[in-house]
Amino acid sequence: MVMIAETSEADTRERVVATAERLFREIGYQKTTVADIARLLRMSPANVYRFFDSKRAIYEAVATRLMGEVETAATAIAFETDAPDTRLRRLLSAIHHMNAERYTGDEKIHHMVAMAIEEDWEVCNAHFERITGIVAKVIDDGARQGVFATPDVSLAAMTVTTAMTRFFHPQVIAQCAAKPGPSLDQMVDFVLAALSPRLPAR
């Protein structure tokens, strides 16, 4: 009985988040009210507040959902069986394309994510840490196989994600879209070259 209740509550939370995301995309997060979400779900605003204690909590849940989709896809790539350099190229490219699609392709969602980053939400910090950890997993595989040469995998992963800011960070992706700079492929080539073992000098 307890398990059924817990499942029902989890389902309701998920419905609230999915509905909030839909409204954020349609009318924007600033114009969306808890009453709007409740009306679409055919429940009272008080019932929504049973699951989320504030509108900010709903914002964070939507952000977590969007970021979680990127993390899930990135993790799947990290655990593929291809060579580490092939996986890292695919991983960095995929993160860029997913972020561009989710956060810059939709202006209303972009505004919410921009606010989350500017206000330093914990969900954003946790997401960046998880993405860095996923990148570190691939670099570690490469270091063990001799494909990459790095004495500090954690530092290498942080360096890579920092180098990819132009292609990872939602605001920077939008701001730099029409500005001169390296292409995604050129940046990934640079990262892979930086991680590759140095040939001995002749």
Regions found by a protein language model. Name each.
Residues 19-23, 94, 98, 163:
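Short amphipathic alpha-helical elements of helix-turn-helix/winged-helix folds
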Residues 2-4, 15, 19-57, 61, ...:
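Helix-turn-helix
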Residues 90, 96-136, 144:
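Short secondary-structure transition hinges
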Residues 61, 75-102, 156-160, 200:
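Hydrophobic alpha-helical connector segments
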